[in-house]
Design a protein with these regions (language model features):
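Active-site beta-loop-alpha junctions enriched in small/polar residues
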Residues: 7-9, 37-41, 62-64, 100-104, ...
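Hydrophobic faces of well-ordered beta-strands that scaffold small-molecule active sites
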Residues: 2, 34-36, 57-59, 95-99, ...
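Short, small-residue-enriched loops and turns at beta-alpha junctions
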Residues: 8-14, 74, 102-107, 134-139, ...
Length: 219
């Protein structure tokens, strides 16, 4: 399968609607599965993308308006992103909201509110990722969030969303792996690219290990 993504325009839209014919052709002529990463996409465009055959939609969600405005620089609020998730669920699409822990320069704060907002929609899947300091950006000198902060958010999500599949996605710092087992214990159902040590520990804890070579939202 593949992840279909891209940069957003000043309004926060990831303009995937222009690729609807190509998506239809891919779905009609290949067995590939498609995960579309959308931003503040209007409902009409979402309808076209759903009808094109997209298998899963990934939507970043946030817990407060300040985080949206500082990090993304758009004139929108947290509820606008939750609204995209709601629209996709209403349209019968598979959707995997994503919460980035520490996205505000490594600082945490919005995440638990984001979990509560997602819990009201009870999606089948919720993905956690975490901030990675990136050279050339405003946050390049900021620290990655602590592992214990990521684990705390996962634990809260497990309590709030007992029937939702919780996954740890690919975008996270791999420098410190010591907290991965704690994340499993907190309630994760799956993890992208776990360390070998984490896999061995999970097996010892009684987890059934299933390897899948695909985007976690499609797994």
């Amino acid at each position: 399968g593949l992840l279909l993504s891209g940069g957003s325009d000043p309004a926060g839209r990831v303009r995937l609607d222009r690729f609807v014919p190509a998506i239809r052709e891919i779905k009609d002529s290949t067995p590939l599965k498609i995960n579309a990463h959308v931003g503040l996409t209007p409902r009409g465009e979402l309808e076209s993308l759903v009808a094109s055959g997209v298998d899963t939609f990934s939507v970043d969600v946030y817990g407060d308006d300040e985080t949206v405005r500082e990090v993304l620089g758009v004139s929108a609020g947290a509820q606008d992103y939750i609204g995209v998730v709601r629209d996709l669920i209403d349209l019968g699409a598979e959707v995997a909201p994503h919460i980035c822990v520490g996205i505000r320069g490594g600082r945490t704060g919005h995440e638990h509110d984001a979990v509560r907002a997602v819990a009201r929609l009870a999606p089948k899947t919720l993905v956690f990722i975490s901030f990675i300091p990136t050279r050339g950006t405003a946050y390049e000198s900021c620290p990655a969030p602590r592992g214990e902060d990521v684990v705390s958010v996962i634990r809260g999500a497990r309590s709030a969303l007992p029937g939702t599949r919780l996954l740890l996605g690919c975008m996270r710092s791999k420098r410190d792996r010591s907290w991965e087992v704690d994340a499993l214990r907190a309630g994760l159902d799956g993890m992208v690219l776990p360390s070998d040590e984490t896999v061995r520990a999970a097996s010892a804890l009684g987890y059934a290990i299933r390897k899948k070579g695909t985007c976690c939202a499609l797994a």
